[in-house]
Amino acid sequence: MTDTRRRVKVYTLNEDRQWDDRGTGHVSSAYVERLKGMSLLVRAESDGSLLLESKINPNTAYQKQQDTLIVWSEAENYDLALSFQEKAGCDEIWEKICQVQGKDPSVDITQELIDESEEERFDDMSSPGLELPPCELSRLEEVAELVASSLPSPLRREKLALALENEGYIRKLLELFRVCEDLENREGLHHLYDIIKGIFLLNRTALFEVMFSEECIMDVIGCLEFDPSLPQPRRHREFLTTTARFKEVIPISDPELRQKIHQTYRVQYIQDMVLPTPSVFEENMLSTLHSFIFFNKVEIVGMLQDDEKFLTELFAQLTDEATDDDKRHELVNFLKEFCAFSQTLQPQNRDAFFKTLSNMGILQALEVILGMDDVQVRGAATDIFSYLVEYNPSMVREFVMQESQQNDDDILLINLIIEHMICDTDPELGGAVQLMGLLRTLVDPENMLATANKTEKTEFLSFFYKHCMHVLSAPLLANTTEEKPSKDDFQTCQLLALIVELLTFCVEHHTYHIKNYIINKDILRRVLVLTASQHAFLALCALRFMRKIIGLKDEFYNRYIMRNFLFEPVVKAFLNNGSRYNLINSAIIEMFEYVRVEDVKSLTAHIIENYWKGLEDVDYVQTFKGLKLRYEQQRERQDNPKLDSMRSILRNHRFRRDARTLEDEEEMWFNTDEEDLEDGEAVVPPSDKMKNDEDLMDPISKFMERKKLKDSEEKEVLTGKASLSGRQSPSFKLSFSSSPKASLSSPPTASLHPGSPGSPSSPGTGARSSPPSAAVTTKGGLVGLVDYPDDDEEDEDEEDADSKEESPPLSKKSKLSS
């Protein structure tokens, strides 16, 4: 027993009534102790894993189809199939199944599950086999009634199928059909329609093989033309013999393959066009017909794939300049149908199929075809290209990068695709939408590979932006040279919307490539011209593009927007929209609201300083007033850097016990002996600390008023020379100005960061000569608020660290805002 005889594919039927390939392996039968019976075992040929372990159940109905298939149901709605490479292997396993069930191996079905009552079951089993009436014109009505009455009962269906098969009854019926048609016997033809339709519902492969044979299939189709419910018969045979004539674009040397193609086309036609739409109850009775077509297609693709001579000739003629247009049109359509057939294959089979086409040069052939003027040929080539991109985008990327080294940009495959998208003549741009989807798949980094030797993402995106992006953006740049789109018709706007949507996708998924392109080519300005379009969908596309850029919170983009005043067309579109409450209104408000909520300082300042006059009267939302408040708070912090320091002090008080990563200087500071600080030296002037806590509880608008009040109080205390407590020693005064400890206690970066707490030069703390008096004034207050003086030393240290971390970004943002 050779391996090939037992080599099988395991299939399961999914919810869509399509067969899923579960793998290839070798089948055997053996007794399985766990299952308590003889079982079918399939082990994968790749790794020996168990693909199938199925007990041969005495009550399960097994069917043998097309000599190499065994089909059965494991449970409700769970069908299995074994497809054998060789008929001999199928026969061996079939004999084993029949042996376990005690059946004759000559039958093609062992039994059917029965859902009738026990009484009906025993009546049927005890009755003799079903006897068919003589096949005569006068008995056709009786035959039709017999078929109709047998369909509800599984056992009667089985007996009817066996009788039809054993007596060669179908061929006799088809002879009567020819007689009735010659005699124009309409009543007999109607009975034959009912009989043949009923035979389809018997769901038997053996009967289908007779009906779909070369000598019978056209007569079967003829019987189904005479539907009693229609006043006139259909003309299916006329269509199949004249309109749908078979053309061998490349001669097929294998007669079996040619016959299989004919048969599959006609059976598919019967299923799709001839048979009436099955009812809910009839749908499951046609499962064998679905399986027949499916396995035929698998067989055809396999036979063509193995015929290297055929495929070599096909691609040679496709790319040959001497091939005339009609011939090339036929070749492309054949290749399209060939690829469509491959969609019935399972993933591993489809991989092998497309790998074969790739090795034969399918992408080179498509490049030639897409450069032709024939619209139909290009359309078919586009469909083939879509199959390839969906199957393996990396294969397509690798090809286009290789060809870029040899060809000009104009004839690159991707640029040809882009040009077809731009030149789509369909008013609804159906082809352009399809091609844009393919481009998106190709430039999507999510399906790009990264290996140790090369990064596909980097290489392909560099190629795309260098060789293809200018072709894609050409219609956009050509149409946005003025303040309004030069062409604003519906079809042009649809195309521009597709282009902008792809650019938006690039902004989201690409990094420096798209950033450099947008800034160097001033793409955002051009896109925002589209906000003046009369078509709202295009204006919204432009707004989405800008919103995606702002959402990145990238200062390169922000500076580009501010430098070129790119909020101007947005504000103009908002004001031109007036009081209309629509998507444009909402989209623009949401954009400004995002800037406010995310506190994008540079854009906030830019918007208020340049566009506030146009927006200040908008009061039906608080977005713009909120932006103005943000701006004023920002200016307040610039004018009073101490305000940021206050916030950091409160934050340090609240979170000072949290674990933090400290720099070396901070570690040294915390490791200093705390006794050195117990003599009254304060890390932060206590008066400042009290004042900070109090100020932050009040609105910022009252800050200056309170500051003046505090300053006046400090001056009064200084003038009055208030007495000091025991802890308020002269050394405390010196610690701020001249003692060696003062340099340790005061923030070491005070000169670099004027806004640091405790710095003598901090704005808003009074005159430059007043810090000692401030310290004297509020030392007593410090003792009342904080229990332990050494806590203050820790607080001051954390304030210093925080000011180091926060001050540089604040000063940078201030420069952007000014």
UniProtKB/Swiss-Prot annotation:
InterPro entries: ARM-type_fold, EVH1_PP4R3, P4R3-like_central_dom, PH-like_dom_sf, PP4R3-like. Residues 670-681, 788-803 have a biased composition (Acidic residues). It comes from the Eukaryota. Residues 703-718 have a biased composition (Basic and acidic residues). The keyword Glycosyltransferase does not apply. Residues 1-100 form the WH1 domain. Keywords: Phosphoprotein. The modification Phosphoserine is found at residues 769-770. Pfam families: EVH1_PP4R3, PP4R3. GO terms for molecular function: protein phosphatase activator activity. Residues 670-818 are annotated as: Disordered. Transmembrane segments: none annotated. GO terms for cellular component: nucleoplasm; protein phosphatase 4 complex. Residues 729-775 have a biased composition (Low complexity). GO terms for biological process: DNA damage response; regulation of double-strand break repair. Serine/threonine-protein phosphatase 4 (PP4) occurs in different assemblies of the catalytic and one or more regulatory subunits. PANTHER family: ATP SYNTHASE GAMMA-RELATED, SERINE_THREONINE-PROTEIN PHOSPHATASE 4 REGULATORY SUBUNIT 3A. Belongs to the SMEK family. Regulatory subunit of serine/threonine-protein phosphatase 4. This is Serine/threonine-protein phosphatase 4 regulatory subunit 3. The lineage of its organism: Eukaryota, Metazoa, Chordata, Craniata, Vertebrata.
